[in-house]
Amino acid sequence: LDLTSGRDRGRLYRIAPTGWKPRSVPHLSHAKTADLVALLEHPNSWHRETASRLLFERQDASAVDGIRHLLRNSKSGLGRFHAIGSLEGLNALTADDVIVGLKDSVAGVRERAGWASEKLAPSEAVLDTLAALTDDENARVKMQLGFSLGEFPPSETRREALQSLLAGSGGDRWIRTAVFTSLGTEASDAFL
């Protein structure tokens, strides 16, 4: 087998049928901020991720209201997911935004909101909403909840939420690991 065979003939980049015309690639770097916000719920991942990156790079505060509207009203779970990250990237994420995300019908959005909640500790309203998720049906949400609760200062609400997570983990080692990571020196209290 000659591995150098064909080296003098160039490289094939695309095989396409005769008459096929490639679609144009959008130049999102020239897009208006409002258009980038709308792209956060685009079905194509490249559009969503590029729009999110450009919003972060621009740090345009005029995007915040549109992103907040998207978080609360988008029919796209991926759009709501990216809205949380974009608000966080613009340093505009509030406890109300996180609570909206934690109450979302899509598990991935709840998980992302749980992660974002860590920056808002010690918000009591966020802690109470996190504590209400201990019986969530999604294991990834529960695991993130276990980690996120560790960022909040010790309290009765936090301890009870971690105990509830541990009791309802169904033997899931990842959830248990998250809970024990958050308990730290309070681990003995969880068993009393």
Which positions does each model-derived feature cover?
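Long, ordered, helix-rich scaffold segments
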Residues: 2-192
